[in-house]
Amino acid sequence: MEEEPYKRKLTKAEKKAKYRTDYAEPLKSRREVLKAIMNGPESERERKVRAKNREFFNEDYRSGVNIYGMAVDMMKAMPDRGKTSGQSLAVWYLEDFGVWLKESGQETELRQKYLTGTIQINALDVCTIGQKQLLSEIFDITKEKFTEDITQLLDAAIKKQDFSVAADMAIQYNLLRDHHFEHLVLPLMLSGKDQTAYKLISNNERMQQQLVEFFDRMVGISVVAVEEMLKPYKETKIMTIPMEKLTGKTLDKLISTIINKNTHEYNFSRELSKFAKNHSQNGNLKALKFNISERYEKGKSDDNYFQHMVETFTKAEDVREPILFYLWSSNDTEKQIDAICFAIYLGIASSSSYQLPNVMRDFFRQPDSKLREAKELLVRRKTLQVPLNGEQLFVFENERRTQIHMVKTESEMNYLCSEIKSLSDEPAPVYVGFDSEWKPSNLTAVHDSKIAIIQLFFKNCVWLVDCVELEKANMADDWWQKFASRLFGDSPVKVVGFDMRNDLDAMATIPALKSSMKIEDTKNAFDLKRLAENVCDIDMEILELPKKTFKLADLTHYLLGLELDKTEQCSNWQCRPLRKKQIVYAALDAVVVVETFKKILSIVEEKNKDADIEKIVRESNVMAPKKDKGHKSYRKLKTIPWLELYDILRSHRNPTRSPQRPHDIKVIVDTMLIGFGKNLRRVGIDVILPKDVSDFRKYLKEIERVGGEHLRHIITVPSKSYEALKMDYDNYTIAIPELNNMSPVDQLIEFFDLFNVDIRPEDVYPRCTECNSRLQIKFPGPVLHFLHQYCVIHVQNVYRADMSEFPLEEWWNRMLHINPDDYDGVKVEMSRPSPTSKWIVATVPTGCLHITRQTALHTNLPDGIEVRIHKVPDDEFKRRNLSFYVCGECGTVACDGRGNQASESTSQEC
């Protein structure tokens, strides 16, 4: 059989020779001169290049050539002609040419003599987009011609679907036109270039509105309908993002970003939310359904529930009918009475009201006893437990009786500011408790003030600053600024909160404080959470807490013996009037942060006499840099020899339980456990590694749909997502606590204990960690070394550009002397069609390797795969008796030093 001619890859030098463009003189000589300068010291380049440019201009002028034509030819010949940033020969040349023309005093005459329309057109063609403005000035190109040229380039870029380039031109030259929404803005969004699209329409309210309306049309419709809507963009390959990004929560998040977040980052209009009616309705519906669930399934207080519902019903009439239907269609009598109660409260309890679902209209035509019960319920609800005028509330009703004062007017704010100022006269530093309650996120635009109440505790009194009432009263900005200054200025008081940075950020959203309150300048804010963490870092035994992570309720329970009632935590703090329970709940948090802070300090003083209390307090300052806790020095799995790893894991097989072989165990890991998943593959477990959350969900749906032998265990860690997974996949979901805090070996031990894995010595590299394939080809190290030397060192000139001739015969002879005993008994058969042929193939029991073609073929596969040998460091081949594994499906190379434990043995994914 006649040998097929061998096609060798070209070296870099050969490619240069083949594709090099030859330039005529003097362009060729000048080009080489400039290249030589650019290869010299960086600090000298610009000065020398600009001096040389002036020599060229003077030389061309004296010789009488067309200086404009020569300038265009030089621009074409520049080695870095397409460069758009950093030091650029083309830019320097163009700038110097413009300066030289002006200094010559003959610019007008030279233009009349040499500058033609053809040269102007050629000039526009040779320069980059960023150079066109300067070039137009030098080559006397009119604004109309310049705009026409840029517009043509922009349209051409759109036609080629090079949307980023088109957007850059439109932004730079202000060329955004009405038709660009359909042909440029949407394609940018649908190809994952959101930030570019936002920048492009940052000053175009009409297109911002169009963008919101486009995505809002997808809210609430089926996936099939969304696919049909986007079909034209899919067919033309404009849309490259996965469909999952435009459905469900990801679509909601995208619209929220456009109408809220972008008002700050890209100066978008603040009125965009009114064009997202479906999104707004959907958000309110979800919030109300969650509120109903909290009330009927988790025992949320009725007054809290009712307050939240009527506030949303009042602000968003479009949710009345669907929510009332949601309550009524439950066929739960209590919920139906609830629906009737809301209808009466809203004044729509009529058989003709269009805001009622049909079933409720029918009810009001012939009402039964539920109507009477609903009216009685409404009477109870309307007599909310709100403070009477002048009624004094207390945090504690016992002998302490800590008073609560409301601040709703300018005069009350003035009095509070004077009280805060008086704290400076105290002989010892005063601790001020600080907390805040926020408005519901679904009823608050991102650019509005987030904060509803600020709570302060000092001198055995709690002050509740009612931000909502003060906003309604249009309190002057000066009072807000005075309040913030007295509290966080140069005051000697210590303001204490829990996880306080979030409260400070919320306070800074008050319009009057947005520009004046600099959180980074705050020096007297201290965080109870950081204080407790710092003490636990010293010694967990000091506070005797069961864990290092905690909420405020945990600390008050363990340290004060006080149980915090959190039923009001998710109240609608924007709704007025505030109920007694809300007021007392809010006030209590401000009290306990100070008392817990002081309690911790007293415990530290008592149990650790050597502790530096001042330092501990100083390090709990909100603005203090967080401690660098460092990273635990875990031993990476790839540095552990296989037999050592095997010895560790085999001891975790329980003989009283049925064992499982690694390849029989099928799992999919959560997106936060990708590294753990690769380690499981390392020991042979069949693992799916999702690329992202949408990919994870896609796999879960597919696994559930197919079922049977395709079912897999879902491995995650305790979290909110785990709770959600258990609801849908309870029988398959496993959460392993603290998994991310374990070393790789401990992670495997935890898994082996859980599944009772039967691992064996021969299981070395049973599965590719990249693609999960079990089709591995094992080669002695010298064979892969030969491949690396030929394909990487020689052909690609990676390490030795001077290697023009490869010592092929020397390597061939070396292959013939490989001793199988040095490489786990792997026998290699070397073959080539003729003694001088460059076709060299190494064959082992599980496959073969075509060395000079960089291709491996597994015995059980029909096609070969390119070996990813360039990923292997050259140093790997210096260790003796090393065996390598090539994946027959993806070409990944891995190695292990198991063959000779006496040598510098290691297990390494290369």
UniProtKB/Swiss-Prot annotation:
It comes from the Eukaryota. The keyword GTP-binding does not apply. Pfam families: DNA_pol_A_exo1, Mut7-C. SMART domains: 35EXOc. Belongs to the mut-7 family. This is Exonuclease mut-7. Residues 404-605 form the 3'-5' exonuclease domain. Represses the transposition of Tc1, Tc3, Tc4, and Tc5, perhaps by degrading transposon-specific messages. Also affects sperm development, sensitivity to RNAi of mainly germline expressed genes, silencing of some germline transgenes, X chromosome loss, and is required for cosuppression (functional silencing of chromosomal loci induced by transgenes) and for silencing induced by antisense RNA oligomers. One of its GO terms (molecular function) is 3'-5' exonuclease activity. Its cofactor is Mg(2+). Keywords: Exonuclease, Hydrolase, Magnesium, Metal-binding, Nuclease, RNA-mediated gene silencing. The keyword Transmembrane helix does not apply. The lineage of its organism: Eukaryota, Metazoa, Ecdysozoa, Nematoda, Chromadorea. One of its GO terms (biological process) is post-transcriptional gene silencing. Gene3D superfamilies: Ribonuclease H-like superfamily/Ribonuclease H. Its EC number is 3.1.-.-.
